[in-house]
């Protein structure tokens, strides 16, 4: 399902633990790390899509998390042509996403990367909040910067830590144009 401008409606998930570290998943059979994300199906709300994707990709249920916030608007990124399926070329531009900030209220052991027959990740780890900006694939970096900055205000407001907001990597702020680990442990799916 694409909108009129060629963007696929999608949700992104920033899942944090009690130390405000973020869940960072390694794409299956690739050396690419990213946040959980996925398309919104016809008739689904962004919240419904978020819970479905959370279960499909991370194995968590609604009772394992608490919603802390979400982005106000759609954040968009363009996908380079060489990543676009041949049959979509000429129509598909990229993703437009609503990002959710979730707090894990369950345990690390509740994470199950094999919750479905088609897993997205084969390993995961907790990383410091800003690490993904240095590690994510380049074409997603601006959207990650926008989402992390907007949601950091919610996450860190009690601790007055927003002074550490990261600067945008490239270009002016626009929703239309879009290292180091904390504990050294990656969690491998099994």
Curated annotation (Swiss-Prot):
Keywords from the UniProt entry: Hydrolase
Listed Pfam families: NUDIX (PF00293)
Superkingdom field: Bacteria
Residues annotated as domain Nudix hydrolase: 6-149
Cofactors, names only: a divalent metal cation
Cited Gene3D superfamilies: Nucleoside Triphosphate Pyrophosphohydrolase
SUPFAM superfamilies linked: Nudix
Nudix box (motif): residue ranges: 38-59
Hydrolase is among the record's keywords: yes
EC numbers, comma separated: 3.6.1.-
GO molecular function annotations of the record: pyrophosphatase activity
Positions of region (Disordered): 167-190
InterPro entries named among the record's database cross-references: Nudix_hydrolase, NUDIX_hydrolase-like_dom_sf, NUDIX_hydrolase_CS, NUDIX_hydrolase_dom, RppH
Alphabetized HAMAP family for the sequence: Nudix_RppH
Function, in words: Accelerates the degradation of transcripts by removing pyrophosphate from the 5'-end of triphosphorylated RNA, leading to a more labile monophosphorylated state that can stimulate subsequent ribonuclease cleavage.
Family statement: Belongs to the Nudix hydrolase family. RppH subfamily.
Protein known as: RNA pyrophosphohydrolase
Organism this protein belongs to: Bordetella parapertussis (strain 12822 / ATCC BAA-587 / NCTC 13253)
